[in-house]
Amino acid sequence: MASRLVSAMLSGLLFWLMFEWNPAFAYSPRTPDRVSETDIQRLLHGVMEQLGIARPRVEYPAHQAMNLVGPQSIEGGAHEGLQHLGPFGNIPNIVAELTGDNIPKDFSEDQGYPDPPNPCPLGKTADDGCLENAPDTAEFSREFQLDQHLFDPEHDYPGLGKWNKKLLYEKMKGGQRRKRRSVNPYLQGKRLDNVVAKKSVPHFSEEEKEAE
């Protein structure tokens, strides 16, 4: 009985392939005049399912992710709490160490700079850990950075005694202040006629006009 069923289904399949699924026998809204490979695979899979020899269809989420539309976002990352790692969540989480080698691995306290080497922004005072009334000079900035290199907050705690921003500020406070310029030096001197700004009207010198 089973052999007759198989032979009948195979003969029907061959008959269908010979006539290439003619619209006179059936209707396909996508390709009415030609059989697609997808239709053939779907038909063969149906025959194999009825015969009991079809393999179960396995779907992978990684392949399905390509079909997502619209804005997508990924949350989580290093040091952002526990994450669901792996398809079954069986990959352990590893907390990243964000401190230096010589700093105690204690996240309960802030392990930032002992004295932040930055001037106070608007609305901040020395109580916020910044430097008030910092001179706006290149010399002060240069000295500030040179003195800052004497102390590495991550690996050089013994160098803490060398860092003293109050003495540095007192040292630089007596220096010359930056003079304000009321004249732009770039606008002085003879104008170059061959330099034309973008989107400007071409300017011809008097010599070119006389030559014409």
Curated annotation (Swiss-Prot):
Disulfide bond sites: C120-C130
The yes or no answer to whether the keyword Thylakoid is present is: no
Q: Which UniProt keywords apply?
A: Chaperone, Cleavage on pair of basic residues, Disulfide bond, Neuropeptide, Phosphoprotein, Secreted, Signal, Sulfation, Transport
Which positions carry Phosphoserine? S141, S205
Which region is the signal sequence?
1-26
Q: What happens when the gene is disrupted?
A: Mice have no demonstrable Pcsk2/Pc2 activity, are deficient in processing islet hormones, and display hypoglycemia, hyperproinsulinemia and hypoglucagonemia, similar to Pcsk2 null mice. In contrast to Pcsk2 null mice, they develop Cushing's disease due to excessive secretion of corticotropin from the pituitary and die before 9 weeks, indicating a role for Sgne1 in control of peptide secretion from the pituitary.
Which GO annotations describe the biological process of this protein?
Answer: intracellular protein transport; neuropeptide signaling pathway; peptide hormone processing; regulation of hormone secretion
One molecular function GO term is: enzyme inhibitor activity
Q: How is it modified after translation?
A: Proteolytically cleaved in the Golgi by a furin-like convertase to generate bioactive peptides.
Function, in words? Acts as a molecular chaperone for PCSK2/PC2, preventing its premature activation in the regulated secretory pathway. Binds to inactive PCSK2 in the endoplasmic reticulum and facilitates its transport from there to later compartments of the secretory pathway where it is proteolytically matured and activated. Also required for cleavage of PCSK2 but does not appear to be involved in its folding. Plays a role in regulating pituitary hormone secretion. The C-terminal peptide inhibits PCSK2 in vitro.
* Name the record gives this protein: Neuroendocrine protein 7B2
Q: Native species of this protein? A: Mus musculus
Report which gene this protein is encoded by.
Scg5
